[in-house]
Design a protein with these regions (language model features):
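A detector of single, family-specific signature residues
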Residues: 1-183
Length: 183
């Protein structure tokens, strides 16, 4: 099954016209194609409502100004986390989302593991997916000899020390901390 509305629509349109598809199945394919169109209209309506909310909300405007954050990330953060005052610091917000390393301690020894993955998985996914283009843009700026800002420089230094995905999670963690400060 293809991912994406346009690919699914094209696949169903081809299947309807295909002689190998039984005649009994074609009305069901028409119904599925209509459901895809209806869902796309509903998604557009929800995105329009979110855009209207973001225009009126000063917090959403500030959150959307953070590199890597867009309409969905800003509104999901406001809906999920509520107010910044619920958290003592940016670290607590990032920890609540599940972006901080899991700590294992025994006696005087402490080790850090992978991210804890606690909290809202949708918000965490949006932040990590927002961090990936930020990292890619930093790499492209280096290739074209353009200057880097502080966050991009830090992201590239981090990527040199670890894998791309770990760097994206660490950037998402930093984005959550920046969001708390801007909120």
């Amino acid at each position: 099954m293809p991912e994406g509305v346009n690919k699914a629509r094209a696949m169903f349109a081809e299947s309807i016209d295909d002689d190998a598809v039984p005649q009994m199945l074609r009305p069901a394919l028409h119904t599925l194609l209509q459901e895809i169109d209806d869902l796309e209209v509903k998604v557009d309506a929800v995105e329009h409502q979110l855009a209207g909310f973001a225009k009126q909300s000063p917090s959403a405007k500030r959150l959307m100004g953070i590199p890597g954050n867009g309409l969905l990330t800003a509104t999901a953060m406001l809906a999920s986390a509520g107010k910044a005052s619920y958290f003592r610091s940016g670290h607590h917000l990032a920890s609540w989302i599940g972006l901080t390393p899991r700590e294992h301690s025994s006696g005087s020894r402490g080790t850090l593991g992978g991210i804890s993955k606690r909290g809202d998985p949708y918000l965490r996914m949006l932040l990590v997916h927002g961090a990936r283009p930020l990292l890619r843009a930093a790499n492209q700026r280096v290739k074209s000899d353009r200057p880097l800002d502080t966050l991009q420089r830090w992201a590239l230094q981090l990527q040199e020390r670890t894998t791309h995905n770990k760097a994206a999670c660490a950037i998402a963690d930093k984005m959550a901390r920046i969001a708390w400060a801007c909120w």
